[in-house]
Amino acid sequence: MAGKRTRKINEGVDPTKLYALTTAIGMVKERAVAKFDETIEVSMNLGVDPRHADQMVRGVVNLPNGTGRTVRVAVFARGAKADEAKAAGADVVGAEDLVEIVQGGKIEFDRCIATPDMMPLVGRLGKVLGPRGMMPNPKVGTVTMDVAGAVKASKGGAVEFRVEKAGIVHAGIGKASFDAKALEENIRAFADAVIKAKPAGAKGNYVKRVAISSTMGPGVKIEVGSVTAAPTA
């Protein structure tokens, strides 16, 4: 039954063809037929080798229409900064007590923020947070004195990205319930951020391939130019 359903969902998607962005979005939305609101993900194959330090691609982008998911935020801070984080809507706030909780394996958050003075303490959690991509980093705005701003950005649609071994960078950029225009705006914002994060060591063709998919649906390949070009009115 599952195989039959998969074949039906895949019908009409030519894996050898490149589709215009707006067409691809429509195809993915049509095939997002699961009983839950599927996440729409974009993946970009880049002409970089992240094994070289000068070809690492990472950054953060604030999606104009949010991600559609509830993001739980933890903040490592003390005193007034801890109060600011709580007022901004942080789900978990602490210092040594929060370090102990995380070291114990209890990670009930999706994103982690810290004030600079907390980093010697948070550094102990590298083996726990690092593999999950949650280690606070000033390059993506998660080590900051503006904890309120960072919490609000995280809750409001900030998405971190980091290139993986095969030169692929990907992220969830919305839900199947989003209208096509909102998804298009989010995809363009993500692609623009990745392009702006092009490292000095990147040679030749930077964006090689782009595809989008839903959680349970097939990948639909997109014409790179239709993602990087300015949208038509």
Swiss-Prot record:
Signal peptide: none annotated. Pfam families: Ribosomal_L1 (PF00687). Gene3D superfamilies: 3.30.190.20, 3.40.50.790. The keyword ATP-binding does not apply. One of its GO terms (cellular component) is cytosolic large ribosomal subunit. Keywords: Repressor, Ribonucleoprotein, Ribosomal protein, RNA-binding, rRNA-binding, Translation regulation, tRNA-binding. GO terms for biological process: regulation of translation; translation. InterPro entries: Ribosom_uL1_bac-type (IPR005878), Ribosomal_uL1 (IPR002143), Ribosomal_uL1-like (IPR023674), Ribosomal_uL1/biogenesis (IPR028364), Ribosomal_uL1_3-a/b-sand (IPR016095), Ribosomal_uL1_CS (IPR023673). It comes from the Bacteria. GO terms for molecular function: rRNA binding; structural constituent of ribosome; tRNA binding. Belongs to the universal ribosomal protein uL1 family. Binds directly to 23S rRNA. The L1 stalk is quite mobile in the ribosome, and is involved in E site tRNA release. Part of the 50S ribosomal subunit. This is Large ribosomal subunit protein uL1. It comes from Rhizobium etli (strain ATCC 51251 / DSM 11541 / JCM 21823 / NBRC 15573 / CFN 42). The gene is rplA.
